[in-house]
Amino acid sequence: MWTQRNAVGNWLLVLTAVIGFLTFIWIPQTSAECQTRSIYCYECDSWTDARCKDPFNYTALPRDQPPLMTCNGCCVKMVRHQRSPYEVVRRMCTSQLQINLFMVDHVCMMESSGNGHMCFCEEDMCNSSKNLHTNGCQLHLIPIAVAVSWLMGQLLSR
């Protein structure tokens, strides 16, 4: 019985190492892509500029849209108090945030209360979208990591 449990533990350890290695190789490449080429991002806050609110009028003439800025990073869209009369939308470039792109590239993060979110994208004017969709590059790793961690915890607690 001990050798069977040991073999399963070793298999899970190898699987975790492989996933970690692939993540280590893959994530810096996507982060670097986001940081090395210039894109245009909308720069506005719906608190002071109604043009920034959702739904965003991306078909309006450029003079009737919020200002664009050159960005050497990713575009960001933050929503606070979503689906309430106090909803605030802010669109900007990551160069204005104290944030590590290694952690957030291609990700939408939800506020713990569920009343807001922050999304990152890397195409021109992509932060105009009402629903930024991630490309799912890293998202598939989250359930795998959770499952492996749970299994390892179960095996080690026996």
From Swiss-Prot:
GO terms for cellular component: external side of plasma membrane; membrane raft; plasma membrane. The keyword Lipid metabolism does not apply. GO terms for biological process: negative regulation of membrane potential; positive regulation of circadian sleep/wake cycle, sleep; regulation of circadian sleep/wake cycle, sleep; regulation of synaptic transmission, cholinergic; rhythmic process; sleep. GO terms for molecular function: acetylcholine receptor inhibitor activity; GPI anchor binding; potassium channel activator activity. The keyword Lipoprotein applies. Residues 77-91 are annotated as: Loop 2. Keywords: Biological rhythms, Cell membrane, Disulfide bond, Glycoprotein, GPI-anchor, Lipoprotein, Membrane, Signal, Transmembrane, Transmembrane helix. Residues 33-135 are extracellular. Coiled coil: none annotated. Interacts (via loop 2 of the three-fingered Ly-6 domain) with Sh/shaker; this interaction may stabilize both components of the complex and may be required for targeting or retention of Sh/shaker to neural cell projections. Interacts (via loop 2 of the three-fingered Ly-6 domain) with nAChRalpha3 and potentially other nicotinic acetylcholine receptors; this interaction is required for antagonism of nicotinic acetylcholine receptors. It is found in: Cell membrane; Membrane raft. Belongs to the quiver family. A lipid is attached at N127 (GPI-anchor amidated asparagine). PANTHER family: ATILLA, ISOFORM B-RELATED-RELATED, PROTEIN QUIVER. The chain crosses the membrane at residues 136-156. Disulfide bonds join C41-C75, C44-C52, C71-C93, C108-C119, C121-C126. CDD domains: TFP_LU_ECD_Qvr (cd23595). Consists of a single Ly-6 domain, adopting a three finger fold stabilized by 5 disulfide bonds. The first loop contains a region essential for protein folding or that is required for localization to the cell surface. The second loop mediates protein-protein interactions. N-glycosylated probably on Asn-57. Residues 128-158 form a propeptide. Glycans are attached at N57. Residues 1-32 form the signal peptide. InterPro entries: QVR-like (IPR031424), Sleep_regulator (IPR050975). This is UPAR/Ly6 domain-containing protein qvr. Bifunctional regulator of neuronal activity in the mushroom body, and possibly other regions of the brain, that acts as a signaling molecule required for homeostatic regulation of sleep under normal conditions and after sleep deprivation. Reduces neuronal excitability by enhancing Sh/shaker K(+) channel activity; possibly by stabilizing Sh/shaker to increase protein levels, accelerating its activation kinetics, slowing C-type inactivation and enhancing recovery from inactivation. Specifically affects the A-type K(+) current. Residues 157-158 are cytoplasmic.
